[in-house]
């Protein structure tokens, strides 16, 4: 079986998601906020899951990050210059809403992150929470609210490449 069959919940995330990332320090004070557009793709090849994150800050700064992932053992796996980790569906979630993810920053073994992703039953919205932990202590929390723009990531990717 392949990634879509083994991870049907993750497969429901395929598409283009627009949202907002809000970061809080350990004391709960907001320290950053920016908008996002994520392209979540399932493709053939060495990296059957590939996510591209486009970030935009209110001051005009932008950033694009690529996250190609391998697939094995009913998980997607990242190992690149930024992160090393994996994501899996929570089998005990009888509503099939929850994906978990953990990773470490490459070159910073003291910092690791756990993410919980909740997909709404209608598949149109999702919320994600990150807990950044350094040396066993909470450093940052990130709250992400997203809505599905379209499942047709190929069309949006082509429009973005054409400057549209």
Specify the residue positions occupied by each region the protein language model found.
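Amphipathic/hydrophobic helical signal segments and adjacent flexible N-terminal regions
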Residues: 1-64, 134-164
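Central antiparallel beta-sheet cores of small beta-barrel/beta-sandwich binding domains
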Residues: 28-114
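Beta-sheet ligand-binding and adhesion/scaffold domains
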Residues: 76-164
């Amino acid at each position: 079986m392949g990634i879509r069959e083994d991870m049907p919940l993750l497969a429901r995330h395929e598409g283009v998601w627009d949202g907002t990332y809000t970061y809080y320090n350990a004391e709960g004070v907001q320290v950053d906020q920016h908008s996002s557009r994520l392209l979540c793709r399932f493709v053939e090849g060495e990296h059957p899951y590939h996510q591209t994150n486009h970030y935009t800050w209110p001051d005009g700064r932008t950033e694009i990050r690529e996250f190609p992932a391998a697939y094995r053992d009913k998980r997607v796996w990242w190992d690149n210059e930024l992160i090393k980790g994996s994501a899996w569906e929570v089998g005990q979630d009888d509503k099939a809403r929850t994906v978990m993810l953990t990773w470490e920053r490459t070159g910073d073994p003291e910092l690791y992150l756990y993410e919980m992703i909740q997909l709404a039953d209608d598949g149109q919205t999702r919320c994600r929470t990150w807990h950044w932990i350094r040396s066993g202590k909470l450093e940052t929390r990130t709250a992400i609210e997203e809505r599905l723009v379209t499942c047709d990531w190929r069309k949006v990717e082509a429009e973005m490449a054409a400057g549209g």
